[in-house]
């Protein structure tokens, strides 16, 4: 989190705290779980299927680590954030890039020693060449010259990695005050890193380095914390996996293998083009009746009257995630105002927008979304009177499915409710059951590997994913993942979504399903129990019992389950969707969340001017491409013009 230049005194004080935290560990609850092997109720076949074990990171001193994480978050919020705001305002982007490059160049001795200690002499030579080139041609390291011109990429190694190569493979995860996430092994390695960092011995230079690095990193940190229900848990998993894979020198992506599953991962390339676009937004809150918290929404408003796009992200999509902001940026650049809320499975919406503790039933989820959008629309009109023309509801993935449901069930006679002139769905699933069973199957794709090969292949896949996210691949080239690797990554992401949803549902009421005791400072044990639940198991263990309790037309059996799932299939609303001039659908023929029957239904039952199906792209994996964006924009602009010219009935 903060400097890698750590004082020995601070580290010793942390060691004392570590000893205290070890005592706290004795208070942790063991993981307990229901034995589903003999269960013969609704959905029994799903509970008794073989499952891949979720990647587990032991955390024996979790109470201590969480306490330090909260302390560090306070520092980031109350000290670093104001500094970042000033720095971002007064420093041009080109200068920020130069400072970042210069600081990275100054870490050359650390990388050099880290490579030497591991016997990586060719890497050490490459690092030396990089340093000489960037320090001379690159004006003291302010301009990155070595990689784009000479092909010399950074060889990032450190003393902690050297310890790992020497045999210290696994180490206790540790959060240090001021320094953030590390392990005992890597924490000791920080002392060696500091010793070979020349800036450590120049107090003012070290201070500038530390302040600059954490200030530059703040926006990424803030979005990560805000977008995740439990950023500590995800941060721990990513940090430890990254360190393990770096030590093991797991392979990075190369050239591509084409598949719909791998193309889906292209969503990582959907990023804002202007890093300052987010700064032009405004964020407000509305109070949804019966919600526990206020619901935030973010908007970008044109100076003149313009169409207003209500943007719904995917399942647990965050309103400020890169993909959401990128779509908003494209729409804003074409003259529309944009407003967005977080997805219905996101922790923000679960706390501030939903009326029931178990999301997953399309009609109720969509109704909650519509209620929230109605409040948002009224609040925007109050703040920006006369600035909005047409209202367009645009949903991505699950947000697109909710968009289509609202299109099919709209009631234009209702007073004081937002009226949409156009409903646009991008990569919306058609059949919820097909989509979630596909995601469950994806998560278990490593079962096809031999048991002794499975751990290595899973970690190799995770290394590829981490490198892709860090921008180590070309956005114009498909990612090099086999279909099974891509499937596992997609399934893994959605398994964490269900974990967070179940945990939050259990906070509101005890469904009698989970057995592990939850503590204020320990979540590892209950998470391990929850992670045993697939999407379909969540449906049968939580959603079905809940609706069987509150609705007389739903019974706790397979008939009741099929009744709920039928209402989550868009074919049930075909009469109001097919041929509706206010409804548009954009998708990809090789989207795994669409069955062949779904694609055929869209192609044959919908009007030709309603549907655009691209040949490739997987699930949202081609939205970063200019040609795809151009087609969507052209069809949208034509549809808006048609709606404007068509007199109301």
Task: Please give the residue ranges for each predicted region.
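N-terminal targeting leaders of membrane proteins
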Residues: 27-121, 210-255, 647-649
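N-terminal cap/lid segment of alpha/beta-hydrolase-fold proteins
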Residues: 256-304
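Short, surface-exposed "cap/lid" segments of acyl-processing enzymes
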Residues: 300-347
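Alpha/beta-hydrolase active-site loop
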Residues: 358-383
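Alpha/beta-hydrolase-fold enzymes
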Residues: 409-529
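Short beta-strand/loop motif that positions the catalytic acidic residue
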Residues: 584-587
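Conserved alpha/beta-hydrolase "acid-adjacent" motif
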Residues: 592-598
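Catalytic histidine-centered segment of alpha/beta-hydrolase-like enzymes
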Residues: 617-629
């Amino acid at each position: 989190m903060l400097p890698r230049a750590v004082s020995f005194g601070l580290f010793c004080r942390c060691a004392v705290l570590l000893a205290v935290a070890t005592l706290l560990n004795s208070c942790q609850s063991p993981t307990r779980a229901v034995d589903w092997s003999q269960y013969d109720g609704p959905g029994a076949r799903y509970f008794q299927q073989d499952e891949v074990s979720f990647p587990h990171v032991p955390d024996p001193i979790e109470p201590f680590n969480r306490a330090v994480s909260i302390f560090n978050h306070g520092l980031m919020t109350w000290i670093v954030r104001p500094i970042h705001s000033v720095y971002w305002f007064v420093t041009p982007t080109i200068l920020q890039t130069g400072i970042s490059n210069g600081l990275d160049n100054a870490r050359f001795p650390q990388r050099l020693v880290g490579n030497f200690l591991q016997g990586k002499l060719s890497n050490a030579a490459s690092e030396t060449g990089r340093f000489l080139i960037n320090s001379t041609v690159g004006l003291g390291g302010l301009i990155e010259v070595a990689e784009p011109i000479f092909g010399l990429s950074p060889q990032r190694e450190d003393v902690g990695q050297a310890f790992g190569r020497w045999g210290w493979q696994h180490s206790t995860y540790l959060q240090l005050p001021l320094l953030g996430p590390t392990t005992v092994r890597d924490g000791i390695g920080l002392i060696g890193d500091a010793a070979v960092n020349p800036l450590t011995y120049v107090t003012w230079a070290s201070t500038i380095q530390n302040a600059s690095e954490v200030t530059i990193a703040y926006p990424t940190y803030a979005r990560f914390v805000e977008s995740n229900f439990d950023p500590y848990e995800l941060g721990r998993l990513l940090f430890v996996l990254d360190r393990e894979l770096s030590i093991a020198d797991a392979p990075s992506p190369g050239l591509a293998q084409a598949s719909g599953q791998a193309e889906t991962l292209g969503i990582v390339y959907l990023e804002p083009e202007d890093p300052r676009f987010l700064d032009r937004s405004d964020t407000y809150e509305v109070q949804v009746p019966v919600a526990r918290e206020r619901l935030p929404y973010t908007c970008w408003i044109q100076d003149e009257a313009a169409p207003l796009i209500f943007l719904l992200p995917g399942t647990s999509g965050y309103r400020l995630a890169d993909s959401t902001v990128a779509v908003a940026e494209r729409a804003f650049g074409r003259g529309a105002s944009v407003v967005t809320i977080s997805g219905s499975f996101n922790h923000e919406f679960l706390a501030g927008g939903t009326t029931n503790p178990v999301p997953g039933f399309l009609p109720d989820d969509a109704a909650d979304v519509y209620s929230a959008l109605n409040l948002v629309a009224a609040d925007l009109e109050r703040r920006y009177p006369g600035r909005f023309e047409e209202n367009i509801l645009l949903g991505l993935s699950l947000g697109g499915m909710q968009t289509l449901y609202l299109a099919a069930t709209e009631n234009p006679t209702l007073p004081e409710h937002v009226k949409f002139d156009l409903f646009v769905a991008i990569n919306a699933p058609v059949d919820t059951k097909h989509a979630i069973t596909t995601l469950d199957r994806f998560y278990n794709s490593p079962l096809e590997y031999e048991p002794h090969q499975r751990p290595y292949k899973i970690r190799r896949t995770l290394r590829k994913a981490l490198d892709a996210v860090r921008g180590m691949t070309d956005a114009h080239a498909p990612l090099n993942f086999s279909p099974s690797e891509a499937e596992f990554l997609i399934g893994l992401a959605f398994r964490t979504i269900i974990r967070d949803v179940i945990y939050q549902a259990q906070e509101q009421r005890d469904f009698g399903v989970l057995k592990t005791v939850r503590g204020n400072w320990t979540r590892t044990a209950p998470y391990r129990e929850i992670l045993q639940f697939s999407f379909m198991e969540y449906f049968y263990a939580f959603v079905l019992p809940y609706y069987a309790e509150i609705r007389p037309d739903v019974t706790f059996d397979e008939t009741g389950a099929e009744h709920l799932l039928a209402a989550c299939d868009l074919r049930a609303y075909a009469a109001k969707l097919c041929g509706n001039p206010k409804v548009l659908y954009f998708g990809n023929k090789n989207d795994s969340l669409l069955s062949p029957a779904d694609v055929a239904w869209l192609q044959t039952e919908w009007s030709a001017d309603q549907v655009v199906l691209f040949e490739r792209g997987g699930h949202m994996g081609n939205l970063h491409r200019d040609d795809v964006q151009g087609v969507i924009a052209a069809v949208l602009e034509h549809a808006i013009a048609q709606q404007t010219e068509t007199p109301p009935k």
